[in-house]
Amino acid sequence: MTSLNLNFRVSVVLVILLSIAFIFINSGFDLEYIIPRRLIKLSAIIIGGSCVAISAVIFQALARNRILTPSIMGYESIYLVWQALLLLFVGTSGSAVLGVVGNFVVSAVLILLYSFVIQFWVLKRFQHDMHQVLLIGFVLTMVLTTVAQFIQIRISPGEFSIFQGLSYTSFERAKPSTLLFAGTVLSILALFANKWVSELDVIGLGRDQAMSLGLNDAHYIPKYFSVIAILVAISTSLIGPTAFMGVFIANIAYSITGSPQYRHTLPVACTIAIVMFLTAQLMVEHFFNYKTTVSILVNVLCGGYFLIITMRARSQL
């Protein structure tokens, strides 16, 4: 058994053990409410974590940069602007009118529409200059974030507290209907990703090498940006913004696999994301008693590990 297979199997076993602990710790074996509710949250963790991991790894392959995530393109900022506008014009009753499912659908559709605008406006003009695409995405992110902050100033304190809750990663908002839809879409995309994974290996070599091997960037860049947009739309609408968690998750996966092949990196990245989310959720529920958020804990856990492996790599130079 190779060390790569061993690492993946260990991560899968860790996911299983953490899932069992998450479901049954302090549950009282309540099959009517507690355990079903935790199963829903566990499903959200698995789906959301997989979306975050896959989108981050694919985006870094396209950008040829391991310190960036899709959030730099402004996808999550659109979500925040929408939530702020909903509270500004409709108030707290807006969430009640739309409901969790309605908000999920509208948020996902808006993110996808924004991604299509990016593709037709930016990618068609600058598809041969990825740095220009990233720069425009960064500027759009700053503009949209500023718009969201401007709207926050105009809403009431009660509405602001609701907005703050929506701006953090949370698994409490998941519903069976949204999970079914998100899981179906993720499964379909996973099948396509499995067929395209050899292309990612070539893309990871660089644009010139990819073109010399027969890959046209005019074809694969829009395709993969569409996949990324769908994954980000699902994860953001389902569990909220994840900001730069994907940076830590993807880089930890690279360090564990030590392989340039994405058929190894993608599954490991998914298991790492699930482990991080499960660990953070367990700590939020049973250690911090909901006095902190999953986002903070995941950034601390992943950031700490990422710093350690960076220092180790530096010391080996």
UniProtKB/Swiss-Prot annotation:
The keyword Cell membrane applies. GO terms for molecular function: transmembrane transporter activity. Belongs to the binding-protein-dependent transport system permease family. FecCD subfamily. Disruption phenotype: Mutants cannot transport ferric-anguibactin and are unable to grow under iron-limiting conditions. Pfam families: FecCD (PF01032). GO terms for biological process: siderophore-dependent iron import into cell. This is Ferric-anguibactin transport system permease protein FatC. InterPro entries: ABC_BtuC-like, ABC_transptr_permease_BtuC. Keywords: Cell inner membrane, Cell membrane, Ion transport, Iron, Iron transport, Membrane, Plasmid, Transmembrane, Transmembrane helix, Transport. The gene is fatC. It comes from the Bacteria. The chain crosses the membrane at residues 10-30, 39-59, 72-92, 98-118, 133-153, 177-197, 228-248, 268-288, 291-311. Involved in the uptake of iron in complex with the siderophore anguibactin. Responsible for the translocation of ferric-anguibactin across the cytoplasmic membrane. SUPFAM superfamilies: ABC transporter involved in vitamin B12 uptake, BtuC. It is found in: Cell inner membrane. It is a multi-pass membrane protein. Part of an iron transport system composed of the outer membrane receptor FatA, the periplasmic binding protein FatB and the inner membrane proteins FatC and FatD. GO terms for cellular component: plasma membrane.
